[in-house]
Amino acid sequence: MASEATRGRSHPRSRSISPRLISLESDAPAEHTFRELVAAYLSATPKVIVHQQGGIRSNTRAVVSSFRERIGAGARLDDAQGDLVLYDLDPESPSGLAHLTFRLGERVLELLRAAGPETASTAREEDWDERDNIVDALAWEVQRRVTQAWLGPRVYGRHERVNPIRWLEASRALERIGDHAVLIAIHGARWRETEPVEAERRLLTEFHHQALDYVDGALVLLGDPRVGSANAALDLGVALRETARTLVDRLLAARSRNSPPPLAVVSLGWVLHSLDRVVAYGMDIAEIALDSARSARPSSHGPPSEDNKGGNEGHE
């Protein structure tokens, strides 16, 4: 109903942002439509209008409906003069950026824990992707809220006076950890099919626990940043990554009596690569905590700085 779509609900900081029009060709691929929807959502627009030449196709409607379900938050979808209108894109009582980022962190830790070599279920790859979709949606929400914070009126209280880009950086690191957790689960299942010996299983499980604990510790630091603790965490991250580089040979040496099958070598390589990336992204979070702690230090040149340096660059 056009009247409902016209009214709608919006986050206070979205009201100064114009509705976003997505104009599609008649044969627009579903993947392209989905990317356009994500970009529109991240722009912090309060309303997305989808127009398609020749009228909305059934596959386009399905993509928009699926996207609405992904973002949740009570988002509504209506028809309006032949177009699709997606609105009410924000919760009525949105959480703060810190709360939202830590909720994302909890989801990522759950996913990473479930993906462990000894704990991963025999779920299909599609099931793991579905879990990762939840992580992606939370990361999108953080980015949307950061955009609202920058484009909307500055209404921060004293306790909120923090550079929101830090939460965006942390959420992106967490999103990538979630991606690698899925890869660990998928390739770990293939590795288990090669019937690894107990010593091999134990070594890989121990390193997975270390990577999981590292990310957990980085999130604790993000909530309570301290210079000394953050530096210690970064040193530990370097040591863990060095361990990952030597672990393949140690793991395969456990199969001393037989040459490991190619599937074992490839699967182990992928699992260890992803565990290395998990630690690297955890280091990014520790660096964000370190920057926050440094910014909070009293300065003889004025009030604490809200500038933020970037984390490790070039991660996959």
Predicted regions and their residues:
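Cytosolic, long alpha-helical scaffolding segments
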Residues: 1-316
